[in-house]
Amino acid sequence: MSTIAQNKGYISQIIGPVIDIEFPNGTLPKIYNAISIKHKNKTITCEVQQLLGDNRVRTVAMNSTEGLQRGIEAIDTGSAITVPVGKCTLGRIFNVLGEPVDELGAISTDRKLPIHRASPLFTQLETKPSIFETGIKVIDLLAPYKRGGKIGLFGGAGVGKTVLIMELINNIAKSHGGVSVFGGVGERTREGNDLYVEMKESKVINEKNLEESKVALVYGQMNEPPGARMRVGLTALTMAEYFRDNNKQDVLLFIDNIFRFVQAGSEVSALLGRMPSAVGYQPTLATEMGALQERITSTKEGSITSIQAVYVPADDLTDPAPATTFAHLDATTVLSRGLASKGIYPAVDPLDSTSTMLQPQIVGDEHYVTAQRVKENLQRYKELQDIIAILGLDELSEEDRLTVARARKIERFLSQPFFVAEVFTGSPGKYVSLKESIDGFKMILNGELDDLPEQAFYLVGNIQEAIKKADELKDK
């Protein structure tokens, strides 16, 4: 306690969320140390960013600095911001400091970890690439996820990002015995609240027994200071790392939105007086992104697979923020408004979504060849659509008509009923193994199911269900 008592300073300057603190000679806190300021029944936590000389440090506040003034006492906590980890975090909502904000009472745990940690050593990494099976046909077949990889999720409003995220959370819990951590970085508070309510409705969060929930939520929304938005991703990542390293689990880490993490870093950089780089971004953009992304990986103990929603400013893919993100991604899942308007869910675009895992030496020849044939078929259908729109189907050659018929069946077979959507659709969710997906698409491509009506393939699980549905349609 004596060192803490010794390490007291006083606020010397406040510029918005940036606070300069003067300490007695020889007691300067370290970079990234948390500084606690108590004022009028509230505690403000700041993080040391720069040592200015003359016994002064420059810090960035994680809470609102409203009401602070020069001369108020500030105490060096002696360590970085620490957050609770473990089972107690499941089903709860936290802020950047690891404080629960869901009004369900305090967290009772002594297990806390600092948010600034080194990435795993090279010797701890799992080097053999393996597929992370999601049970969602379109993803597993055409743009498979890497276990311990990073996936970019692209899509506008209302195309099904949230439902896809919730289905992934549900499936990892059921099939991998894993948990998920959701980091809401700089997005709308209303969206965060909607997600929480939907998770309770779909039983992803178990209200009766919180520790049986499948997800922990960490929010630093749009109205928070830039310091909080910049660090909330690290808070979520620290919770995920504990599940991977100590519980030896497979973890899904969702970051919505990775662009807001960069944006907050840019605001902080400007407030600290750093010279801006290209397009006004921080000069440390690549370093900050690397520090976050390098901690998301597979080790010999478990894995963190990260799915990151990527906002592309003004649809400019060359903007430094998305361009820096792309360098770290192993797969991209692109959601299409066109497919959503056709009622095909999940509305994952089979031609725009990509994955570095789709190589014959990783997924095997059968999977690779089937995926390529599906894409070729859909691409040919896309090329023929203009002709169909102008002249009609009858003007196509016999071969092209067959291609169109199969492509329409494939398009419908890529749809799938979700577990988390059961409450809305009334149809039970389906988990389809990769083997079942490959077998089903091979049968369609080989013409074994040419005599089945295309509506038999819509919103079913495996191919046997489609055949059964076709029989039921015939009976009607």
Swiss-Prot record:
Cellular component, GO annotation: chloroplast thylakoid membrane; mitochondrion; proton-transporting ATP synthase complex
Record GO biological process: proton motive force-driven mitochondrial ATP synthesis
EC number: 7.1.2.2
Entry binding sites for ATP: G155, G156, A157, G158, V159, G160, K161, T162
Catalytic EC class: translocase
Localization in the cell: Plastid, Chloroplast thylakoid membrane
InterPro entries: AAA+_ATPase, ATP-synt_VA_C, ATP_synth_F1_bsu, ATPase_a/bsu_AS, ATPase_alpha/beta_chains, ATPase_F1/V1/A1_a/bsu_N, ATPase_F1/V1/A1_a/bsu_N_sf, ATPase_F1/V1/A1_a/bsu_nucl-bd
Alphabetized SMART domains for the sequence: AAA (SM00382)
UniProt-listed Gene3D superfamilies: 2.40.10.170, Bovine Mitochondrial F1-atpase, Atp Synthase Beta Chain, Chain D, domain 3, P-loop containing nucleotide triphosphate hydrolases
Recorded topology in the membrane: Peripheral membrane protein
Catalytic activity of the protein: ATP + H2O + 4 H(+)(in) = ADP + phosphate + 5 H(+)(out)
Gene Ontology molecular function, alphabetical: ATP binding; ATP hydrolysis activity; proton-transporting ATP synthase activity, rotational mechanism
Major location category of this protein: plastid
Entry keywords, A to Z: ATP synthesis, ATP-binding, CF(1), Chloroplast, Hydrogen ion transport, Ion transport, Membrane, Nucleotide-binding, Plastid, Thylakoid, Translocase, Transport
Function summary: Produces ATP from ADP in the presence of a proton gradient across the membrane. The catalytic sites are hosted primarily by the beta subunits.
Database matches in PANTHER family: ATP SYNTHASE, ATP SYNTHASE SUBUNIT BETA, MITOCHONDRIAL
Known partners and oligomeric status: F-type ATPases have 2 components, CF(1) - the catalytic core - and CF(0) - the membrane proton channel. CF(1) has five subunits: alpha(3), beta(3), gamma(1), delta(1), epsilon(1). CF(0) has four main subunits: a(1), b(1), b'(1) and c(9-12).
Entry similarity comment: Belongs to the ATPase alpha/beta chains family.
Protein name (database record): ATP synthase subunit beta, chloroplastic
Organism: Galdieria sulphuraria (Red alga)
Lineage of producing organism: Eukaryota, Rhodophyta, Bangiophyceae, Galdieriales, Galdieriaceae
